């Protein structure tokens, strides 16, 4: 019965009831099935023995026989199975298993096989044969690999059974999976089995999800299994595998711990522990024990399972990164396999290990054995070539290498083939780096393609071949610069890409990470190098070379010499042989040089030159790096130190000796270029040019010297003419397409595209099929603003080269030119020709067409069509991800979703945008754009509780992300967490001093905290970075706010007024602040209850002027949407008068805004202050007090802070006038709690103590106020001097008076009333 019939509602199978659940049997069978499928046959037998020792279970006993057969224990299997051939319930299964065992014997007993086949036929035709017998036979045939026969047997079993059995559904699922049937129907079979709590059904679900690369769903399914089925180890193993797929290495270790197995008891668990240890933990001290535990576990559980030993060996070698210790341990595993069976594949694997360890003799021996064996493994086929290259027999190796692909075409798909090709390219006559680079690129690309279809897991890691990748990296060492260069060249980029590939898979391989640090250091990216070194030491702090590189970095970055010394000593402690290397002495000399101990530096360098040169290895796979080429760097450093000490003659002699020593060797060319680079780093530009000019045509480094000279002329001397002349000289000597192209690149670099076009066209004539050259011509036309020519060129090139990238470039250009119709036509054309693209690369290109089409449709205001384009792009992307979901594909899926979400965000369709962002995060959980967009949306929707999580995710990935840090700081600000907010805003300003939003918040927070100097430093720093920032509205609002806090209202008004004509935002803030100052100049209330009752002409006129000016500013705001803040300002202006009717009208409006319908709750603190102010002006003080008390207990926040402060100050003022000073102090202290710099609070406090004649306490308050205003406010100066006088602090009084008069000569009142009296008192 096919699985398709399970979907049929009329299927008789569906009308049957489910059979009995035998939980213990199910668990045992599921365990055995799992281990047998995974190749752990010995472990499966132990599970069988454990159950069979306590209970009779014929079906399980048959499975034991199957496992014995799979393990190659044929006699044991036959003896065991013969006892069950008469058991009617399992006879068919026993007979099939017995037939398989006999057929697997070294000398099969054909007579016995015929007899068994006869018995099978008889029983199969017998109607009385029970369904269990057929079901058991189906199991046996499944494990024998006869899936079609297995299915036939299972169909009969299901028909004969009177009940439905979960075991049957599950087995059918595994058979269909093996036959490659539709996975949807197969998944339904597993789900039906799993629904009946049959463990292997859930394992099947995990297998399908693994094939779909659906790690999160697989982890959920495995987790359900681990929880629901107690002590079912495969559930924990599958969960660990899902964690590996997600690269959640900590989760892997959690699964191992939760499995709760004694160390070394289960080989599968130990494999996972070992993979975690090598790929992630990287703890060298623990790794030896971990590998020993794995070997012990295999010896105890799988002693005769040579296939498993070999499989684990291959896994270890593949993830070793060619680490010597791991390879030696791997050899121990392979030795077990080879003792049992000397299969050709095992010998080839042995060859791979020997090659990795650099054992030329062993490789030679194994090569001779492999030649005699029939083995298609690339290590076997290429073994003799490898052997020859390891002893420098280049010509013999090349001759054999050239003919091998014709006999073995599959070699061209082998990464090892391209590694050998790269070595031979280095040994060719022209020593072309381009050829070498191409072979390494092919190696990386070939490996990447082979891995693409595999989910990230144990099979992926077995194929990964980090040992080969690291060998490829080592080959690049010979092209490394001797001293750091300004920007990475092709070699450094290639190496970094390869190393990054290793790091992405196995960050625990510290020696590979160290090479990333070294790469960054040589590319002058010291920040990245430092971070990589930290990661290296985090994994393996015993790596001496990491400490040495750290010392070098510290010195180059101008760090503490003691730190560099410490790093050197630490490195030396871990590897004392470092004293015998030139590098150690080179770095040691630099520490002496930093201390100006130049004689010691020279002595150390000379000592390094006396170290005997190591004999270069004949092994061409070993880089010359290991032969200590740092000697050249030592010679260059010695020359530089001697020159620094004016010992010119000695320096020249050293240079001559160095050139003579390396004469005729490739190092000689490197020496000259490195010397020029060294001069350049010291700022000696002319010396560098002088050395490079000496290199003449015909010398191997002529090409490189002229490119270096061009770089110096452009970047150091800003001489475009000489920059071009260097390339012209190159062209004169080498008139190749490459030289013409280089000259074109040079003119593009100096913004002269017309000249570039001429040279590019010349190169294209010589190399007409070069698509990259054609692209460069198109780019040059665009740079030259020759758009119609660019369009025509792209159109013709698109038709000539049939290149999809040309179509993209044409469409992009048409989009920029706003030629939407033609752009749409160009992008739609491929879909009209081929609506259903096939192949990963083609589909990816079509996705780019759709994304560009979406942009085009959005610009045409055809948003529905743009959304349709995005959906098509996602649909195409899902077709690729069904096959494989690599990290790059995940990021691409997230990018598509992000572009769609950004479109929705721009249209303020937030709900849909959030949904699409979540789709992006399903692809890539830590995607920066998606998380950042979610944060922005939640911020705009005022959903602050949702802002934090996506924002923190961004910061974890990118700690210096400006936008995320700004949103996070705002989150803390809104939550009134001042300390957190200050720290976050300060971090932003350290990165960008002109981050006006952060600066405005910092001014607010610091001034409230009494740290005006700190606030002013940030303002001054912004001005230092960009003196023109004084014209920017953001700066002026921040400065105005600072001046307001420090009591200079006129200065504040001056800064605010500069923003009146700027764009909304800062302008709006400034206008509100200006209105506030107009109504409350110098922090003094002009209109009070007395002026309303008895209006004086001067007060009425002054109030009228202020009101008019405030109205003017309000009118400027009138075009903005009416908000609560606008209404507050409007009514405060209306109240700023002596007209009682106007005051009452404003009061009524404030009453409407301040409370809810039943007046039980405050809805607007600003309006409450307005109500209270109105009551005070109308001499209804008690009513004012009652209203103000309603804000008591309100949680303080920055939004309400100004008006809460005003309410508390008004209450304090009322209590002071009523002589209730204790109550007044309560509210003044409340003000100081949130604004320890409040001038009005200082004033009221001082006034209150004056009334009590406590002049010492009064002057302390006035002192704080006067200091807060930078001693510029004459009012506070007067009050301070007066209280000094009353407290008999006469000299302080006179000094204060003098300060006031120095700044305000027009303030004679202080001299007459206070200063003169103080002087008179001193005289008496």
Curated annotation (Swiss-Prot):
Pfam families recorded for this chain? ARM_TT21 (PF25058), ARM_TT21_2nd (PF25060), ARM_TT21_4th (PF25068), ARM_TT21_5th (PF25064), ARM_TT21_C (PF25063), ARM_TT21_N (PF25062), TPR_7 (PF13176)
SMART domains the UniProt entry points to: TPR
Describe the disruption phenotype.
Shorter cilia with an irregular morphology resulting in functional defects characterized by defective movement, dauer formation, and mating behavior. Double knockout with intraflagellar transport protein ift-43 results in defective cilium morphology and function.
**Localisation per UniProt entry:** Cell projection, Cilium; Cytoplasm, Cytoskeleton, Cilium basal body; Cell projection, Dendrite
What GO CC annotations are associated with the protein?
cilium; cytoplasm; cytoskeleton; dendrite; intraciliary transport particle A
Q: Name one GO biological process term.
A: cilium assembly
Identify the stretch annotated as signal peptide in this record. Answer: none
Q: Where are the TPR repeats?
A: 58-91, 414-446, 582-615, 669-702, 737-770, 772-804, 806-837, 847-880, 894-927, 929-961, 963-995, 997-1029, 1033-1066, 1205-1238, 1240-1272, 1274-1307
Q: Known SUPFAM superfamilies for this protein?
A: TPR-like
Alphabetic keyword roster: Cell projection, Cilium biogenesis/degradation, Cytoplasm, Cytoskeleton, Repeat, TPR repeat
Q: Which PROSITE patterns match?
A: TPR, TPR_REGION
Highest taxon of the lineage: Eukaryota
What InterPro entries is this protein classified in?
ARM_TT21_2nd, ARM_TT21_4th, ARM_TT21_5th, ARM_TT21_C, ARM_TT21_N, TPR-like_helical_dom_sf, TPR_rpt, TTC21A/TTC21B
Provide the free-text tissue specificity comment from this protein's UniProt record. Answer: Expressed in ciliated sensory neurons in the head and tail.
Subunit organization: Component of the IFT complex A (IFT-A) composed of at least che-11, daf-10, dyf-2, ift-139, ift-43 and ifta-1.
Give the family from UniProt: Belongs to the TTC21 family.
Chain's role? Component of the IFT complex A (IFT-A), a complex required for retrograde ciliary transport. In particular, may act redundantly with the intraflagellar transport protein ift-43 to regulate the transport of specific ciliary cargo proteins such as che-3 which are related to motility. Functions in cilia biogenesis.
UniProt name for this protein: Tetratricopeptide repeat protein 21 homolog
Q: Quick one: which gene encodes this?
A: ift-139
């Amino acid at each position: 019965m096919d699985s398709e019939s399970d979907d049929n509602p009329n299927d008789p199978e569906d009308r049957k009831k489910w059979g009995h659940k035998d939980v213990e049997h199910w668990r045992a069978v599921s365990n055995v099935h799992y281990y047998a499928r995974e190749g752990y046959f010995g472990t499966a037998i132990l599970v069988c023995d454990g159950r069979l020792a306590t209970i009779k279970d014929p079906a399980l006993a048959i499975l034991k026989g199957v496992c014995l057969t799979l393990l190659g224990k044929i006699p044991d299997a036959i003896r065991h199975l013969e006892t069950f051939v008469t058991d009617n319930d399992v006879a068919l299964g026993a007979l099939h298993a017995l037939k398989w065992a006999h057929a697997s014997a070294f000398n099969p007993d054909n007579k016995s096989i015929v007899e068994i086949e006869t018995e099978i036929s008889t029983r199969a035709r017998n109607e009385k044969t029970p369904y269990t017998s057929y079901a058991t036979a189906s199991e046996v045939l499944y494990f024998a690999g006869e899936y079609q026969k297995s299915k036939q047997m299972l169909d009969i079993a299901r028909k004969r059974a009177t009940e439905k059995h979960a075991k049957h559904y599950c087995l059918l699922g595994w058979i269909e999976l093996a036959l490659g049937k539709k996975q949807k129907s197969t998944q339904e079979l597993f789900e039906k089995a799993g629904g009946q709590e049959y463990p292997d059904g859930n394992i099947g679900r995990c297998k399908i999800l693994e094939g779909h690369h659906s790690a999160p769903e697989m982890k959920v399914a495995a987790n359900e299994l681990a929880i629901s089925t107690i002590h079912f180890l495969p559930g924990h193993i599958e969960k660990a595998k899902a964690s590996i797929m997600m690269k959640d290495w900590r989760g892997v270790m959690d699964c191992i711990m939760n499995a709760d197995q004694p160390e070394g008891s289960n080989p599968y668990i130990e494999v996972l522990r070992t993979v975690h240890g090598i790929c992630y933990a990287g703890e060298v001290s623990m790794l030896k024990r971990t590998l020993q535990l794995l070997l012990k576990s295999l010896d105890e559980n799988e002693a005769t399972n040579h296939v498993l030993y070999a499989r684990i060996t291959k896994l270890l070698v593949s993830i070793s990164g060619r680490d010597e210790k791991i390879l030696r341990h791997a050899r121990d595993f392979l030795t077990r396999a080879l003792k049992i069976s000397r299969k050709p594949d095992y010998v080839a694997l042995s060859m791979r290990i020997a090659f990795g360890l650099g054992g030329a003799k062993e490789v030679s021996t194994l090569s001779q054995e492999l030649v005699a064996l029939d083995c298609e493994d690339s290590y076997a086929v290429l073994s003799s070539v490898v052997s020859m290259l390891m002893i420098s027999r280049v010509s013999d190796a090349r001759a054999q290498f050239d003919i091998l692909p014709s006999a073995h075409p599959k070699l061209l798909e082998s990464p090892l083939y391209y590694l050998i090709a790269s070595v031979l390219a280095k040994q060719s006559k022209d020593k072309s780096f381009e050829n070498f680079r191409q072979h390494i690129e092919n190696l990386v690309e070939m490996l990447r393609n082979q891995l693409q279809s595999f989910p990230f897991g144990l099979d992926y890691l077995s194929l990964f071949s980090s040992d080969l990748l690291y060998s490829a990296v080592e080959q690049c060492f010979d092209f490394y610069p001797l001293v750091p260069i300004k920007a990475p060249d092709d070699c450094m980029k290639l190496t970094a890409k390869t190393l990054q590939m290793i790091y992405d898979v196995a960050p625990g391989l510290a020696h590979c990470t160290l090479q990333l640090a070294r790469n960054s250091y040589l590319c002058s990216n010291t920040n990245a190098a430092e971070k990589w070194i930290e990661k290296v030491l985090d994994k393996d702090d015993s790596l001496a070379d990491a400490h040495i590189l750290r010392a070098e970095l510290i010195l180059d970055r101008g760090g503490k010499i003691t730190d560099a010394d410490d790093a050197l000593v630490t490195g030396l402690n871990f590897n004392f042989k470092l004293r015998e290397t030139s590098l150690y002495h080179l770095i040691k000399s630099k520490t002496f040089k930093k201390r100006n101990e130049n004689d010691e530096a020279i002595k150390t360098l000379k000592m390094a030159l006396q170290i005997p040169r190591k004999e270069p290895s004949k092994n061409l796979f070993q880089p010359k790096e290991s032969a200590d080429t740092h000697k050249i760097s030592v010679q260059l450093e010695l020359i530089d130190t001697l020159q620094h000490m004016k010992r010119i003659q000695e320096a020249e002699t050293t240079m001559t000796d160095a050139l003579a020593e390396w004469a005729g060797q490739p190092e000689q060319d490197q020496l000259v270029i490195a010397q020029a680079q060294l001069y350049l780093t010291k700022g000696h530009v002319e010396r560098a040019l002088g050395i490079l000019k000496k290199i003449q045509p015909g010398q191997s480094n002529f090409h490189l010297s002229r490119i270096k000279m061009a770089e110096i002329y452009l970047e150091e001397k800003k001489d475009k003419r000489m920059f071009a002349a260097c390339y012209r000289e190159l062209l004169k000597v080498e008139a190749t397409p490459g030289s013409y192209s280089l000259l074109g690149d040079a003119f593009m670099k100096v913004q002269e595209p017309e000249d570039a076009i001429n040279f590019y066209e010349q190169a294209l004539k010589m190399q007409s099929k070069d698509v990259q050259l054609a692209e460069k011509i198109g780019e040059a036309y665009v740079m030259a603003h020759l758009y119609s020519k660019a369009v025509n060129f792209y159109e013709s090139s698109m038709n000539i080269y049939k290149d999809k990238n040309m179509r993209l470039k044409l469409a992009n250009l048409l989009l920029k030119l706003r030629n939407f119709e033609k752009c749409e036509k160009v992008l739609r054309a491929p879909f009209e020709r081929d609506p259903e693209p096939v192949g990963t690369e083609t589909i990816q290109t079509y996705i780019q067409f759709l994304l560009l089409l979406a942009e085009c449709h959005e610009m045409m205001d055809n948003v529905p069509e743009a959304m349709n384009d995005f959906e098509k792009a996602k649909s195409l992307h899902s077709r690729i991800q069904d096959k494989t979901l690599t990290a790059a594909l995940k990021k691409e899926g997230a990018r598509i979703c992000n572009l769609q979400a950004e479109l929705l965000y721009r249209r303020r369709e937030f709900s849909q945008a959030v949904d699409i962002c979540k789709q992006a995060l399903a692809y890539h959980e830590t995607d920066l754009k998606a998380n950042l967009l979610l944060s922005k949306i939640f911020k705009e929707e005022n959903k602050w509780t949702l802002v934090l999580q996506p924002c923190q995710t961004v910061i974890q990935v990118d700690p210096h992300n400006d936008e995320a840090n700004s949103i996070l700081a705002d989150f803390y600000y809104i939550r009134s967490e001042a300390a957190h907010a200050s720290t976050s805003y300060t971090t932003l300003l350290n990165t960008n001093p002109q981050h006006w939003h952060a600066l405005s918040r910092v001014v607010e927070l610091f001034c409230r905290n009494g740290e005006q100097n700190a606030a002013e430093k940030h303002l001054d720093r912004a001005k230092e970075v960009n003196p023109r920032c004084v014209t920017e509205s953001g700066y002026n609002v921040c400065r105005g706010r600072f001046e307001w806090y420090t009591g200079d209202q006129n200065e504040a008004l001056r800064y605010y007024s500069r923003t009146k004509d700027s764009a909304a935002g800062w302008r709006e803030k400034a206008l509100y602040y200006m209105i506030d100052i107009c109504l409350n100049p110098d922090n003094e209330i002009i209109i009070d209850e007395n002026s309303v009752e008895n209006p004086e002409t001067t007060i009425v006129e002054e109030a009228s002027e202020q009101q008019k000016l405030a109205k003017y500013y309000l009118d400027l705001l009138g075009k903005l949407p009416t908000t609560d803040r606008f209404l507050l300002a409007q009514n405060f202006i209306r109240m700023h008068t002596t007209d009682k009717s106007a005051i009452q009208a404003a009061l009524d409006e404030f009453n409407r805004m301040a409370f809810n319908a039943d007046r039980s709750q405050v809805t607007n603190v600003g309006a409450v202050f307005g109500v209270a102010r109105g009551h005070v002006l109308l001499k209804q003080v008690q009513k004012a007090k009652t209203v103000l008390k309603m804000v008591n207990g309100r949680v303080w926040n920055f939004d309400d802070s100004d008006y809460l402060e005003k309410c508390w100050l008004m209450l304090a003022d009322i209590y002071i006038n009523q002589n209730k000073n204790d109550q007044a102090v309560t509210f003044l202290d409340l003000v100081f709690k949130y604004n320890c710099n409040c001038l009005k609070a200082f004033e009221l406090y001082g006034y209150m103590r004056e009334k009590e004649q406590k002049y010492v306490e009064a002057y302390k308050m006035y002192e704080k106020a006067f200091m807060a205003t930078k001693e510029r406010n004459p009012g506070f100066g007067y009050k301070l001097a007066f209280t000094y006088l009353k407290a008999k602090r006469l000299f302080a009084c006179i000094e204060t008076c003098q300060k006031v008069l120095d700044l305000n000569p027009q303030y004679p009142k202080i001299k007459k009333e206070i200063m003169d009296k103080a002087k008179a008192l001193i005289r008496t």
